[in-house]
Amino acid sequence: MKLSVRYVFRLVLIAAVVGCTTQFGVQKFFHSSIFKRWMYERLISGNEKQQLRAAGALAYVRAEEQLLTAIKLDAPATRKLAKKALEFTWFTAAGEDAEKQLNGAMEAASQERYQEAIDMLNKLIARKPTFAEAWNQRASVYWKLGRHEESILDCERTLVLNPHHYGAWQGMGICRLHLGEISEACRCLREALKVLPHDEPTQEALEKCEELLHKERSRDGVEPTSQII
């Protein structure tokens, strides 16, 4: 998500009005809690244009706390903007060069050039080992290849680096389901819904997992009403 030059100029003018006249002062203002709260209020209560700009601004200053709050709201349009902005912060967390390499790997994977994608992601991870999205994208490629154990390991690493990564929780849940680990699959999908509670595909996947777990426990003689861990 990119901010228009005109909008950035307006923000700089506002920063100047509140006394941030140096470049350092402007940047400090943009990353301040005051600015983030202001943009959050615009995101949840502004008109369509204001919401779009606010989402871009929150992505620009990497305001994950505000965006993680916004994706839980009841307003679908606000959630959609917040989710896009949040994922932008994750994809760009390691810098422009890393983002380009990540996009290249994703393009290769989309064309089913999976080994090429893995090779690119291996290099990226070696260079940027704390880049959570690189691990997550490699997990996705492993999943597409049916290499579920390796995908789970990469999802786990993603979550060490970014505990809020709902995509990693979702992916790990699906992989564990493929491995027959139904209880663990349910747990992972619940964790994803804690972060992204309105996501319908995850809700549907969890319902199916819980049905399978219910049948499994009934078959094994476990009380159907027992708590699903």
Enumerate the predicted regions with their spans.
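Register position in tetratricopeptide repeats
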Residues: 60, 88-92, 110, 144, ...
